[in-house]
Structure formats: C-alpha cells, structure tokens
C-alpha cells in the first residue's frame, strides 16, 4: 500500500471523527498490511490518505490494536523520557523526542466498545505519535 508523501497536506490536517462502519475493518486490515510492508509499529489513517480518526499500533509478535477516535492522558506514574523516533512518512529522518513514558489511551475498538488501556515505553510513544498524526502534527515539528 502506498503512503502519502511527507509534504501531503493531509498530514497537517486534523482528522474527522471516524464513524464505525462496514468499511472500518477493511481500512484497519489495509493499514496493518501497510505496517508490515514498512516494518512499522504504528500507522495513522492520514498516512495512507484517509481523513479519519483511526490508527493501528502493534506488531506481529504482540498483536495489533485498532484505535478509533483515540485520546490519551498522562498516567500518574509517568516520567518524561527521550525516545529516538522514526516515521514511515519521513523515511530518512530519526529525531529524539521527549514524551511521557506511561499513558492511558482511550479509544473505540472495531466492535464499537470504548476502552481505556495503559501503554508504556515504546507503546506509549507509538500511541502518542499516531495520535499526533490524527491531529495534524508531524514529529518533525515537535
């Protein structure tokens, strides 16, 4: 699956709320395939040209989490931590970004259930990075 160019205006656009539909599962599946093709641990819908608030994080070894209309807040025990981040939209760029290392992510799953889960370390980083994409923020501007 082709990703949008790093200069595509959709990467600077706040995404529309995702309305769960029959197409949600196919979109999620396509995004997981794209993640595998690009060896990524996260992908947001705008990175494939879709203006909708849906992201996927995970890996074949850990499983994938589809997050619809996600939000996050800092967990009580969180500390700011520097992470070396990459992004499939910026394939030749890695930056050190400071982010909370423990968050509570809230999202709707493909069954329409609103859930909250704790994400730590690299998974907290990935959740925040993909949420940034859904809010029109790319890591090169942080």
What is the role of each PLM region?
Residues 1-142:
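Positively charged
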């Amino acid at each position: 699956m082709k990703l949008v160019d790093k200069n595509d205006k959709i990467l600077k656009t706040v995404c529309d709320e995702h309305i769960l539909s029959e197409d949600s599962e196919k979109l999620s599946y396509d995004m997981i395939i794209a993640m595998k093709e690009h060896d990524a641990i996260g992908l947001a819908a705008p990175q494939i040209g879709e203006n909708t608030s849906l992201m996927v994080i995970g890996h074949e070894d850990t499983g994938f989490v589809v997050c619809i209309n996600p939000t996050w807040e800092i967990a009580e025990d969180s500390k700011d931590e520097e992470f070396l981040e990459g992004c499939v939209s910026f394939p030749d760029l890695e930056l050190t970004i400071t982010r909370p290392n423990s968050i509570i992510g809230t999202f709707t799953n493909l069954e329409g259930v609103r859930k909250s889960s704790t994400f730590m370390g690299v998974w907290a980083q990935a959740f925040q990075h993909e949420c940034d994409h859904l809010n029109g923020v790319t890591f090169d501007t942080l």
